[in-house]
C-alpha cells in the first residue's frame, strides 16, 4: 500500500513528468473484486435504496415542471450549469424526450446492479404558501405523484415514494390517496418546498402519516442541489421533532450532513453544525426505533471530513442508518473526490482505480460499493454494515406489507 508520505513526495516528480496522480498507473483492486467484497453479507432481495429522484422536463405530458431560471443560461448561468450537470449525470442523450430517456437510463442502471432489491422513486410536490395556494414562481421543479406512480410500473425493482405538501388544503385527503395506491413513504425537501416541519399546519399530515404507516423522508441540513437561498433554516433537523412527537417514523436524508442551523435548544440560538444537531436527536432515547439517518451524500467533498468518519465511528447507531443514493447525484463526478477520501483514510489506495471505473460504468453501483469498502477508525475496509442496505421492516412498514 502506498503511504501518504510516499504519495506527497512523489507528487512533484510525477507532476514534472506530466503524469496525473489518479491511480491509473497502479493495477489495484479490480472492479469485480470490489463488487464481491461489497456484496458480502448482503441479501440481494432485501437491498433498499430509499433515495432516487424522478426528474424530467414535462416531455410526454408527464406534468413535470422545471423553473425557467434553471434553463436560462444567459440570465441565470449558475443554475444553468447546475441543471446541465444533472442532465449529464443522468445519462440523458435525447433532449427532446428527457422524461422517458431519464427513466430508461435509471431502469437500466438499477437492473444492472448485483442487488435484486428495491429502489424508491420520489415525487416532488410544488411549493405552497401558508394559505395553501400553489406558488409556481417559487417552485424550482416538481414531479407529480401520478408520473412517479407510472414510472414505478417500469420495473419490479421500483417502489413509490409520494410527495404531498402539508400546507395543501387537501393534504390529508391526498396522503390517504397515495397510501391507497401503495406509497411507502413521503418525500419532503423543506428548504426547497418552503415547509416548516415544526409548523402546526403540518399536524394533520403527521396524523395521517402515523395512521397509514407512511414514513417521512425529509431533507436535513442546508440544501445546495436545489436553489434555496432564503429558506435554509427550514432544513434544521431539530424542526422534525414535531413529526416524531406526532408518532411519525422519520428518515433524515443525508443525516443532515451539510451546513449549519440554529440550535433551538440553546437560549442564544447559536448556529451549529446541522450534523451535530441531528446526532443529538439520534442520541435521544425517546426517538430510538423512530428516527433514522439516511447516508446519501455523506461522502461528498463538502461534508465528508465530518459526516463520513462521524457516522462510521458510531457503530452503536449503524442499525438506525439506511442507504440512499440521491440519484442522479452520484453521477456528478466532481462531487465525490476519491483522492480526498483516501487522504482522509476512508478508502485504500489500491481500491481507488476500481472505484473510479465503477462510478463511470454505473454511478449507482459505484455509490453502493464505495459505502461498503470504506475504512473504519481502525483503518480496516469494513464499510457500512449490511444492515444499512437491508434495513428492518420497522423503517418502512408499508413496504414490508407489499406483495413480493
What label would you give each PLM region?
Residues 21-50:
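C-terminal segment of N-terminal export signals and the immediately downstream linker at the start
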Residues 27-30, 258-404:
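H/E-rich (His + Asp/Glu) clusters that bind or coordinate divalent metals
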Residues 48-50, 122, 161-162, 187, ...:
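Active-site neighborhood of phospho(di)ester-bond hydrolases with catalytic His/Asp-centered motifs
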Residues 62-134, 141-151:
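Alpha-helical scaffold segments that flank or form the walls of functional sites
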Residues 6-27:
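N-terminal export signals
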Residues 1-3:
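N-terminal secretory signal peptides
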Residues 29-31, 118, 123-233:
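Active-site gating/metal-coordination segments in enzymes
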Residues 47-57, 216-221, 252-255:
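Histidine-centered catalytic micro-motifs
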Amino acid at each position: 500500500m502506498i503511504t501518504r508520505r510516499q504519495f506527497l513526495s512523489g507528487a512533484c516528480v510525477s507532476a514534472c513528468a506530466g503524469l496525473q496522480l489518479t491511480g491509473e498507473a497502479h493495477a489495484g483492486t479490480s472492479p469485480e473484486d470490489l463488487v464481491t467484497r461489497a456484496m458480502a453479507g448482503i441479501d440481494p432481495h432485501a437491498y433498499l435504496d430509499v433515495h432516487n429522484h424522478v426528474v424530467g422536463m414535462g416531455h410526454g405530458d408527464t406534468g413535470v415542471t422545471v423553473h425557467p431560471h434553471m434553463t436560462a443560461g444567459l440570465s441565470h448561468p449558475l443554475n444553468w450549469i447546475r441543471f446541465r450537470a444533472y442532465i449529464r449525470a443522468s445519462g440523458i442523450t435525447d433532449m427532446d424526450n428527457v422524461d422517458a430517456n431519464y427513466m430508461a437510463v435509471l431502469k437500466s442502471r438499477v437492473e444492472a446492479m448485483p442487488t435484486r432489491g428495491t429502489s424508491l422513486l420520489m415525487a416532488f410536490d410544488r411549493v405552497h404558501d401558508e394559505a395553501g395556494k400553489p406558488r409556481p414562481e417559487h417552485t424550482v421543479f416538481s414531479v407529480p405523484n401520478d408520473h412517479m406512480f407510472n414510472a414505478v410500473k417500469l420495473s419490479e425493482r421500483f417502489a413509490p415514494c409520494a410527495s404531498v405538501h402539508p400546507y395543501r388544503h387537501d393534504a390529508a385527503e391526498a396522503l390517504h390517496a397515495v397510501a391507497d395506491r401503495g406509497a411507502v413513504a413521503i418525500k419532503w425537501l423543506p428548504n426547497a418546498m418552503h415547509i416548516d416541519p415544526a409548523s402546526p399546519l403540518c399536524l394533520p399530515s403527521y396524523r395521517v402519516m402515523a395512521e397509514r404507516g407512511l414514513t417521512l423522508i425529509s431533507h436535513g441540513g442546508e440544501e445546495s442541489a436545489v436553489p434555496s437561498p432564503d429558506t435554509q433554516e427550514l432544513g434544521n433537523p431539530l424542526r422534525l421533532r414535531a413529526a416524531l412527537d406526532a408518532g411519525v417514523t422519520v428518515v433524515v436524508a443525508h443525516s443532515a450532513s451539510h451546513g449549519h442551523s440554529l440550535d433551538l435548544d440553546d437560549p442564544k440560538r447559536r448556529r451549529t453544525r446541522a450534523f451535530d444537531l441531528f446526532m443529538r436527536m439520534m442520541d435521544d432515547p425517546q426517538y430510538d426505533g423512530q428516527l433514522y439517518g439516511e447516508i446519501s451524500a455523506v461522502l461528498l467533498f463538502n461534508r465528508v471530513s465530518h459526516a463520513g468518519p462521524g457516522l462510521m465511528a458510531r457503530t452503536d447507531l449503524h442499525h438506525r442508518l439506511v442507504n440512499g443514493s440521491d440519484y442522479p447525484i452520484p453521477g456528478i463526478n466532481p462531487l465525490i473526490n476519491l483522492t480526498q477520501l483516501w487522504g482522509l483514510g476512508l478508502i485504500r489506495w489500491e481500491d481507488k482505480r476500481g472505484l473510479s471505473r465503477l462510478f463511470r460504468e454505473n454511478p449507482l453501483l459505484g455509490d453502493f460499493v464505495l459505502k461498503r469498502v470504506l475504512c473504519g477508525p481502525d483503518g480496516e475496509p469494513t464499510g457500512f454494515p449490511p444492515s444499512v442496505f437491508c434495513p428492518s421492516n420497522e423503517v418502512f412498514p408499508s413496504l414490508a406489507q407489499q406483495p413480493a
